Amino acid sequence: AGSGFLSLCAHGRLSGLALEAGAAVSHVTAVRDGRALRGAGRRLPLAGEHLCRHLQRLLRERPAEPPAPPALGKKALTQLKEQYCYVSLDYEAELREEGCQPPARFQTPDGRWLTLGKERFCCPEPLFRPQLLQHSCPGLHQLAGQSLQALPEHLRRHLLGNIVLSGGSSMFPGFPERMCLELNSLFQGAGVQVEVLASPKRGTAAWTGGSMAASLTSFRHSWMTKDEYQEHGAHYVHVKF
């Protein structure tokens, strides 16, 4: 089954809007009664790996601080991103004020210390402003809006109250609140309160949902067997689901 549907399963839902921000790519998937609505799917070619590289650039380009050392590899950057970065609720205002959170200090593998200021909230901002990484596509919240606008009004209203976050790049502090603010702004005249569901374990929600779904006897008709895979190939998964 699609990872968007499985993320919904982890929250006990068969219908909803799944917003997945992972390592290599981010997705928006509208699901109704366990089926992904293909015309409403959206893709953002930007996720955690891009944010790590963005953080590296931010650290190297600081004029008033020593640049990040070459020893700051992918593992250290990922640790730095996950432990100290957050999503701002008002990016422009916080950028003017150099951040509302205190600076953080991080020791690199070679023993040097780095101080992080505005890099803490500038790192994940491209999820909402892809143009910061020279991408012309809309932000994840705007793609969610496009997906919802592609649906009939009654279904759109239902899904606005069932928005589920998943993936490691949705784990930034402030990410759920920012997403809720942005979507409420996009749909302020809809007369529906946007509800964004963010489990503390949402980083592995798709895996959890897959485990739950596979344990249900009612889901067995959707399994792709080894014989089917050998007969039809990997593309058959799109026929089954």
Language model region names:
Residues 1-241:
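C-terminal region/appendage detector
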